[in-house]
């Protein structure tokens, strides 16, 4: 019923008062076969009945049919207003227009029930805050890799060395074969 799972560390990275927790994660469920109630405890992942926290973003709470992984009865999100606001905040941050950048990210945070980011924040810290906010807001929506590539922060966020070539994509071989003026990226 859910092929997306979260690590306990990511689940616990949300602020306790963040309203997105209840719409992002399945934290409890009732087994339709025996009526038993299960509650997720990120501090007790050894519990075999509910050891992993599943993402709830693509689940229909009224759908109790067992389906194959990836077969969801609700629509996937392509773009959301929060994405527009956070992209705008990121652009303003890169122009060092901190006040303008804070407007968008703080709207997203307010909707999630969180306090605004203070206006005294540095550009570097705001850049990190925007990426973290995008991570929480778009969990399991496929944005993180592109965000980390764009901000060139894969090594920092993943906690390990990342070869520079992974910040770009190679050109398809058949395209470079067809066009001699098209040169492959030097790292590939």
Per-range role (PLM):
Residues 2, 71, 76, 109, ...:
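Long, intrinsically disordered, low-complexity segments
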Residues 9-81:
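Flexible, polar/acidic helix-loop-strand segments at domain edges
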Residues 18, 75-107, 127-137:
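Extended, hydrophobic/aromatic-rich amphipathic alpha-helical segments that build helical scaffolds
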Residues 19-20, 29, 97, 147-150:
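Acidic, mature catalytic/reactive cores of soluble proteins
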Residues 21-22, 100, 116-119:
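Acidic/polar loop patches that form or flank catalytic/metal-binding clefts of enzymes
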């Amino acid at each position: 019923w859910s092929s997306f799972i979260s690590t306990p560390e990511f689940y616990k990275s949300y602020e306790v008062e963040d309203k997105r927790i209840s719409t992002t994660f399945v934290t409890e469920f009732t087994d339709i076969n025996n009526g038993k109630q299960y509650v997720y405890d990120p501090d007790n992942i050894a519990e075999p009945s509910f050891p992993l926290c599943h993402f709830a973003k693509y689940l229909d709470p009224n759908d109790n049919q067992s389906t194959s992984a990836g077969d969801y009865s609700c629509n996937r999100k392509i773009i959301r207003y929060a994405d527009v606001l956070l992209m705008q905040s990121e652009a303003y941050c890169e122009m060092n227009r901190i006040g303008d950048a804070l407007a968008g990210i703080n709207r997203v945070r307010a909707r999630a029930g969180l306090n605004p980011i203070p206006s005294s924040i540095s550009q570097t810290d705001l850049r990190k805050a925007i990426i973290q906010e995008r991570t929480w807001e778009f969990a399991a929506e496929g944005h993180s890799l592109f965000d980390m590539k764009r901000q060139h922060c894969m090594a920092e966020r993943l906690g390990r060395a990342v070869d520079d070539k992974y910040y770009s994509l190679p050109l398809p071989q058949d395209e470079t074969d067809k066009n001699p003026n098209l040169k492959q990226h030097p790292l590939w």
